[in-house]
């Protein structure tokens, strides 16, 4: 029986093999510890501040800036808050 090497997952950031001792997982992809950083600001990430979009890693702030809602009325602060009490949901 011929020797068949085990396939190791490739890091989406650098394309090299990722071994179990150095892997970080986000969005179902395995990254190297050194590649596990925001693709916009290069901030080191962990499981609490990491977001993945199409194999790219982002911190939550940069992800919101790049893919969040844009235009007039978004990010307006406390003036945009609603005082809806949900009365329309209590139909009896």
From Swiss-Prot:
Its main location: cytoplasm. It is found in: Cytoplasm; Nucleus. A motif (Nuclear localization signal) lies at residues 65-70. In the embryo, expression is restricted to the somatic, visceral, and pharyngeal muscles. Within the somatic musculature, MLP60 is distributed throughout the muscle fibers. There is no expression in cardiac mesoderm or in fat body. GO terms for biological process: cell differentiation; muscle organ development; muscle tissue development. One of its GO terms (molecular function) is metal ion binding. Residues 11-62 form the LIM zinc-binding domain. The keyword Disulfide bond does not apply. Gene3D superfamilies: Cysteine Rich Protein. It holds the Pfam family LIM. GO terms for cellular component: nucleus; Z disc. Keywords: Cytoplasm, Developmental protein, Differentiation, LIM domain, Metal-binding, Myogenesis, Nucleus, Repeat, Zinc. PROSITE patterns: LIM_DOMAIN_1, LIM_DOMAIN_2. Positive regulator of myogenesis. This is Muscle LIM protein 1. It comes from Drosophila melanogaster (Fruit fly).
């Amino acid at each position: 029986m011929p020797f068949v090497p085990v396939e190791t997952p490739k890091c989406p950031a650098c394309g090299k093999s990722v071994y179990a001792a150095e892997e970080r997982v986000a969005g179902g992809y395995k990254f190297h510890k050194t590649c596990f950083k925001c693709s916009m600001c290069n901030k080191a990430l962990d499981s609490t501040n990491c977001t993945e979009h199409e194999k790219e890693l982002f911190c939550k702030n940069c992800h919101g800036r790049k893919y969040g809602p844009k235009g007039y009325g978004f990010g307006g602060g406390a003036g945009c808050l609603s005082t809806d009490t949900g009365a329309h949901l209590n139909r009896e």
